[in-house]
Amino acid sequence: MSVGILGTKLGMTQIFDEAGVAIPVTVIQAGPCTVTQVKTKQTDGYFAIQVGFGEVKPKALNRPLLGHLAKSSAPALRHLNEYHTDSSSDYALGQQIKADIFSEGQIVDVVGTSIGRGFAGNQKRNNFGRGPMSHGSKNHRAPGSIGAGTTPGRVYPGKRMAGRLGGKRITIRKLTIVRVDAERNLLLIKGAIPGKPGALVSVVPAKVVG
């Protein structure tokens, strides 16, 4: 598995290809990330690197985390993430990982947190149909039956009902990188990704099978 990168979602826009066709893209501020730990098979049982992103004031972090970051001479970083690799020999503590590790046309997966929409009903959360809106009906947006009677005498686990919508970890797979701005560390990815502008995202090379 190749190394990914942490970044923030900046928003969406559109660019035009050679034929003049508009392509909707999401702009991601990708890195720069600092390698804060290198894991090897001898010391940890597997190969991986840990990267940090999002510089903050030192007082925002606790002392154990500041001590961990000091080993790589990294500044105070808010977010840490680990990426598995086939070999960690190509990476060193304090190394910078930037947007240029990706290329145009590359297929990637984007991991983020979906926008939280609070408590939502069945129509919005589960795409249920509604009841009649006229002719004396009082069942407009009610959930309807949630089970039988005495048997089974309970509501089955997993029954789709009203509840909190969004705010969950989401992975959007097999998106295409349309453009890489190595100078400004920007990635332009075709399509939408989870989260609102400013949200933390992780971009990793996709596992394309076949």
Curated annotation (Swiss-Prot):
Presence of keyword RNA-binding: yes
Spans annotated as Disordered: 122-155
GO CC terms: cytosolic large ribosomal subunit
Pfam families assigned to the protein according to its UniProt record, in alphabetical order: Ribosomal_L3
Molecular function terms, GO-annotated: rRNA binding; structural constituent of ribosome
Biological process terms in GO annotation: translation
Domain of life of the source: Bacteria
InterPro entries named among the record's database cross-references: Ribosomal_uL3, Ribosomal_uL3_bac/org-type, Ribosomal_uL3_CS, Transl_B-barrel_sf
Gene3D superfamilies named in the record: 3.30.160.810, Translation factors
NCBIfam families hit by this protein: L3_bact
PANTHER family, per the entry: 50S RIBOSOMAL PROTEIN L3 (PTHR11229), LARGE RIBOSOMAL SUBUNIT PROTEIN UL3C (PTHR11229:SF16)
Function: One of the primary rRNA binding proteins, it binds directly near the 3'-end of the 23S rRNA, where it nucleates assembly of the 50S subunit.
Family to which this protein belongs: Belongs to the universal ribosomal protein uL3 family.
Summary of subunit composition and partner proteins: Part of the 50S ribosomal subunit. Forms a cluster with proteins L14 and L19.
Annotated protein name in UniProt: Large ribosomal subunit protein uL3
Gene name linked to the record: rplC
